């Protein structure tokens, strides 16, 4: 998740560059959950012993990276079209705690088709040259990496982003690269 202090830092940096064009009232910063990410960037949480406390260098790298991505997007502002679509993706995941889910009141369970959310939502961003990006939400908990993993990973959502971007020719070197984001839906 994004710590509130990172959001505040990014907003301050954006205001230094753009004035009041971007503020906490009109910028949404979202992170995709992973069990394979580094810690050390939370200022609002006590030291859990798992991440060793605050690492200013890591905090700076995250705040600078988010700020740079927003500046890059602002530099490329242009008219475009946003398409939206949704659909059902069956058999792609499982409820991590089906027993606990069954303890929900019957009225709550009756609201849903299954014990997991199988709906996927997709936004597609298009300009005069074609598709320039996509944003996808699907409720699949990113725990594909096991406990023996010692590497930083975006898990299956990061891998999906990488694959989608490569299919669209992204080389991470130009302002016109396709951007794919597979965001976290339900927790």
Give the predicted meaning of each segment:
Residues 1-187:
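Conserved beta-alpha junction segments in alpha/beta enzyme cores
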């Amino acid at each position: 998740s994004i710590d509130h202090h990172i959001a505040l830092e990014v907003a301050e940096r954006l205001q230094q560059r753009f004035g009041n064009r971007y503020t906490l009232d009109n910028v949404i910063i979202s992170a995709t959950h992973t069990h394979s990410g580094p810690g050390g960037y939370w200022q609002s949480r006590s030291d859990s012993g798992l991440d060793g406390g605050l690492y200013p260098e890591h905090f700076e790298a995250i705040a600078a990276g988010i700020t740079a991505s927003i500046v890059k997007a602002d530099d490329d502002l242009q008219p475009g079209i946003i398409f939206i679509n949704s659909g059902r993706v069956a058999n792609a995941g499982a409820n991590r705690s089906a027993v606990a889910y069954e303890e929900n009141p019957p009225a709550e369970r009756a609201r849903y088709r299954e014990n997991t959310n199988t709906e996927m939502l997709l936004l597609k961003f298009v300009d005069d040259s074609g598709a320039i990006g996509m944003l996808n939400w699907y409720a699949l908990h990113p725990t594909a990496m096991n406990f023996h993993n010692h590497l930083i990973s975006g898990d299956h959502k990061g891998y999906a982003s990488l694959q989608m971007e490569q299919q669209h020719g992204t080389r991470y070197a130009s302002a016109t690269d396709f951007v794919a984001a597979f965001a976290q839906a339900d927790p």
